[in-house]
Amino acid sequence: MPSEAPLSVLALNASLKHEPSLSNTGELASLVLDEMRALAPISASVFRLSDAKLPVGLGFRESAEDDWPDLVTKIRDADIVLFCTPIWWGGRSSLMQRLIERLDALDEEYSSTGRSAIKGKVAGIVITGSEDGALSVMGSIMMVMTWMGFMLPPECAAYWVGEVGQPTSQDRDKRLRNMATMHMAKGLAQSLVYYARLLKAHPQRFVAGKATCCEMHANLEAPA
């Protein structure tokens, strides 16, 4: 029996910290990747947004130094994409917001051509923070991902938040001992692997036809 081809996993770390600094977000993402490795062969890579050049804009290439085209290639090649962000003042980090804004170019590609680099890919979410906001950030990212065409499985997120008023220097030790976060990481890994395998075995097919939602899309042919 032939061996199973590894699942390609891309973790997008939107921590504001630069390499080689440790981040709670990066370490929780690594825990999820380790849980996935225990379930299936994977080929995993981590892209740290803070060390990339991703200028403001909605185009495919905003400058000669723009790293976005290379990142799009990584996203296209991935079976699973992990969106990993810390919480800043109750919301996702500015780097996660920048990523979402740049992804809009791929969403517009689908609207205008009927082809998508992201539709049907399995996505998961990793969130860390010092006090609160995890569920709010999770919900807002889930809304964006599902409308862009990512497939969100059950238990699609893992998070950890620290205790109100306590020194952030204690966050890492507390997170590493938090059984609930470990349980969420395991559940997230199981869901991602299961649904990525399912979609590889049964790829999503688009029904051929023309969109009728508006004049702009009147001649849009969906791929067969």
Indicate where each model-derived feature is located.
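Glycine-rich beta-alpha junction loops
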Residues: 16, 130, 159-162, 210
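Surface-exposed beta-strand edges and their flanking turn/coil or helix-capping segments
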Residues: 24, 59-60, 138, 152-153, ...
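Short, glycine-/small-residue-rich phosphate/pyrophosphate-handling segment
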Residues: 114-160
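Conserved anion/nucleotide-ligand pocket segment
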Residues: 148-156, 160-161, 167-180
